[in-house]
Amino acid sequence: MESVLNEIYEDWFFRDNIADSLPMAKYLAPKIKEYLNINSVFDVGCATGHWLSVYEEHGLDVSGLEGTTNSIPHMMVDSSKINIHDLREPYQKNHDVDLVYSIEVAEHIEPEFADNYVDALTRHDAPYILMTAAPPGQGGHGHFNLQYKAYWIDKMQAKGYSIYEELEDKIIEWCKIARETSNAPSEFLRVAVDGDGTGLLAGQVRPVSYTHLRAHETTPH
């Protein structure tokens, strides 16, 4: 199965992924760390580990999950921290972390394996989960499962996680401030906002964040 993913996600995909997403990680990851007061993260679908590399620079313990070995030559963290696993099969490991996140990965998982993906997010009982997912109508390479937000919310609630709107709103606020004040690298503004407020984290593809039902008392205000 790994060979199938290697054919879909070739070398160019990971080069482009770094160029498109690293500026966003550099801008948002420190803010997320401070807001949630977290010490460890697990990235589901980490690609080159570029988000992980930023969290690591800010002192967090990091680990990740990626589906293809084509990512390894581009990996920005120690590859020993990355689990190579195709989510067409259930992921069996548990990670003791404060935050599980998954940025623009859900749409790459075929619908029949979506529950494997959700289990890979929730099985660790982390206090917080943050994900973004492409909705119907959004193009993109390897997009097999374009769903509206409610689809993922229902699956996460079935696993004991409730929506955490405060963090969603905070991320949107950070992105809008960046756009209005240019308080972010130009590369971030190009990728995240697209100039008209409808980019990855500034409009139609809102982040979806969750807090574990058993962790409500620790939710920051």
Regions found by a protein language model. Name each.
Residues 132:
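Alpha/beta-hydrolase-fold catalytic nucleophile elbow
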Residues 108-109:
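A short His-aromatic
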Residues 215-221:
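A short, hydrophobic C-terminal helix/tail in secreted or cell-surface proteins
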Residues 127-128:
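Short glycine-centered segments of the SAM/dcSAM-binding site in methyltransferase folds
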Residues 1-103, 112-124, 135, 139, ...:
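Conserved N-terminal segment of class I S-adenosyl-L-methionine
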